[in-house]
Amino acid sequence: MKRKAKSILFFLLSTVLFAQETDGLAEGSKRAEPGELVLDFAELARDPSSTRLDLTNYVDYVYSGASGIVKPEDMVVDLGINNWSVLLTPSARLQAYVKNSVVAPAVVKSESKRYAGDTILGVRVLFPSYSQSSAMIMPPFKIPFYSGESGNQFLGKGLIDNIKTMKEIKVSVYSLGYEIDLEVLFEDMNGMEYAYSMGTLKFKGWADLIWSNPNYIPNISSRIIKDDVPNYPLASSKMRFKAFRVSKSHSSKEQNFIFYVKDLRVLYDKLSVSIDSDIDSESVFKVYETSGTESLRKLKAHETFKRVLKLREKISMPEGSFQNFVEKIESEKPEESSPKN
């Protein structure tokens, strides 16, 4: 009985903490919100430069001589809203559906009760009628686990760190009432994908869609501390945003599905380990820097390859170089003629 009472109390507290009312917010929507920020499309619309990824040094690496054909500006990318895309499930990838499944920046009206004047992510997906289909709304590149001088360039911009247990996930959405389900996909450093169901978008107006961990026990899960973990290097504890995924059932007649996303936040328990304060092991052995740099090198090479591959449809290029690249990227060691990050 006590456990049940505690669970009810936690539910009420977490509702107040994370699931705010959506109808009565005016300028209060600008105040600081709880949880760790994963993505804020209003911030990305204002200035995406902090998420810039420069791939220009990798063009000749993936295709010898291609730097004379590829424009340098095409190889500098960021998480700006215009760079996001919709990827339909294979069964729905007919030209008409692909052409009309797009993302676009959308300005919230000044009289809106929430996020007035902000520019957010607008999504339109065109599905076949009476067909079970899904689509992913994806960033322009995989979020790097390690990038920038400190390796933390993308923290709060698609990347979260030091995760022990995921408690809650919140997506602020404006829906037009379509019968479609929304999921959030994350990926850890081992390539494991995690799908979190946020529920239906069959409502009109603003809402905070929330996933809560059904296995999380408050005041117990957060207190479980294992100090038998070596201080350095720590095991993988980062997760990156992979995509939003929307799905519709075969019974739905609707084809057009439109909705808007303001931001994505998470609540989680953090890893608790004792800190080696006497010696800076990273400055001595550089395990994080070495593994992070190699991970970023591979990510940049693959992202560059994808972009050059798209250009290849418009420009005549020999087939052999692409096969050579595929073989090289799998076998080449980091120190062997790799471009600088």
Curated annotation (Swiss-Prot):
Residues 1-19 form the signal peptide. Its main location: periplasm. It is found in: Periplasmic flagellum; Periplasm. Disulfide bonds: none annotated. GO terms for biological process: bacterial-type flagellum-dependent cell motility. One of its GO terms (cellular component) is outer membrane-bounded periplasmic space. The keyword Signal applies. Component of the outer layer of the flagella. The flagellum consists of an outer layer composed of repeating units of FlaA around a core that contains several antigenically related polypeptides. This is Flagellar filament outer layer protein. It comes from Borreliella burgdorferi (strain ATCC 35210 / DSM 4680 / CIP 102532 / B31) (Borrelia burgdorferi). The gene is flaA.
